[in-house]
Structures are given as structure tokens and as C-alpha cells.
């Protein structure tokens, strides 16, 4: 009697112990698949982020008058671009510099502008942009000229991927106004093909 009682629990335990390893194996497979998918998503996100470059144009300490007194914070002006015809200018405010820069980068990516580039990494036509009291004039240049501009205007043009251009600043010298004026000028650029289509003429008539 003692032998039969001792053997029956062993059989039950052996049968019950065989089920959990199979379930554990399935869970491990699911986890490994999820990790692979998550790894692919992370890689894609890193590749997208690696295409973009950020440059801080200005960091200022600003204050806001509230009921309890003055609240101090930092304001960062950031230019974001991929040097392939996309560029944006963003402004971020936070209690620390790092937070302000991060908000500026996020704001810049929300306000991207596509710039039509020529084979010589220049712009197709002359353009003028204005923001507040600042005015910026940009015109195409021959290969080897470089970026003839200064301040925040130069930063915007370089991150847009323009390598040969002439720019002139008129009016206000404020970095934010100049950067936004340059963005307005770039947003108004059109390719020769698009201009011909809008005017209803051929490309030969534009070049002539």
C-alpha cells in the first residue's frame, strides 16, 4: 500500500511539470519576436534622427512677471535641417537650458520648409523674405562661391543644404527675426518647372 501511494503522486507531478516548459517556451518566443520588432523600430527612429542636424543660434535668459514676482526661464533658438532641402526654425522655453533646446528642436521639426535645390547646390531664383523689421534677400551664386551670409541666416542656409548663395540682411539684426525672414524667403522659392506651369509658359521662355 505504501508503494502504490508513493508512486501515484510521482506520476501526477511528472505530468504537471511537462506542461509549463512548453508554455514558457511559447512566451519566450513571443518575447523574442517583440524584442526584434522593437529593435527594428528603434533602429528606424535612430536613422531618422541621425539625418537631422541641430544648431543653437541663441540662448537667452528671460523673465516673466507673475503675481509672486518674476519667473526666470531660458529661451533657445534652434535651427534644424537635414542638408537635403528641409530646414526649420524653432523656439523653446524651459527652466533649464537642455529643456529649452529640446523644445526648440521639436518646434523646429514642426515648422519645416522644403527648399528646391539646383544641381550646383544653389537656389533657382532670387527671393526676398520679411519678418517684423528684418528683411533678407537671397540670390543664386555660381559653383565655388560658398555661402556668403552671416549670423542666423547662414545657419539656416547651410542646414538647408545650400552651398552656393549670396544673402543680404536689411533692417533688424535680431537673430530670430533674421532666421524667420530667411525661412520666408526660402518658402517662396519655386523651381523653373513649377514657375513655368504657374505662368502657363514653356521652360524655354523662362530661360530666354
Curated annotation (Swiss-Prot):
Domain S5 DRBM: 52-115
Composition bias type Polar residues, residue spans: 1-15
Basic and acidic residues bias locations: 25-37, 44-54
SUPFAM superfamilies linked: dsRNA-binding domain-like (SSF54768), Ribosomal protein S5 domain 2-like (SSF54211)
Pfam families attached to this UniProt entry: Ribosomal_S5 (PF00333), Ribosomal_S5_C (PF03719)
Membrane-crossing residue ranges in chain numbering: none
Keywords for the protein's UniProt record, in alphabetical order: Ribonucleoprotein, Ribosomal protein, RNA-binding, rRNA-binding
One GO term of the biological process aspect: translation
Coiled-coil ranges (or none): none
Signal peptide positions (record): none
GO cellular component, one term: small ribosomal subunit
Region annotation Disordered: where it falls in the sequence: 1-54
Gene Ontology molecular-function annotations: rRNA binding; structural constituent of ribosome
InterPro entries in alphabetical order: Ribosomal_Su5_D2-typ_SF, Ribosomal_uS5, Ribosomal_uS5_bac-type, Ribosomal_uS5_C, Ribosomal_uS5_N, Ribosomal_uS5_N_CS, Ribsml_uS5_D2-typ_fold_subgr
Similarity comment text for this entry: Belongs to the universal ribosomal protein uS5 family.
Domain commentary: The N-terminal domain interacts with the head of the 30S subunit; the C-terminal domain interacts with the body and contacts protein S4. The interaction surface between S4 and S5 is involved in control of translational fidelity.
Oligomeric form and interacting partners: Part of the 30S ribosomal subunit. Contacts proteins S4 and S8.
Role noted for this protein: With S4 and S12 plays an important role in translational accuracy. Located at the back of the 30S subunit body where it stabilizes the conformation of the head with respect to the body.
Protein name as annotated: Small ribosomal subunit protein uS5
Species: Prochlorococcus marinus (strain NATL2A)
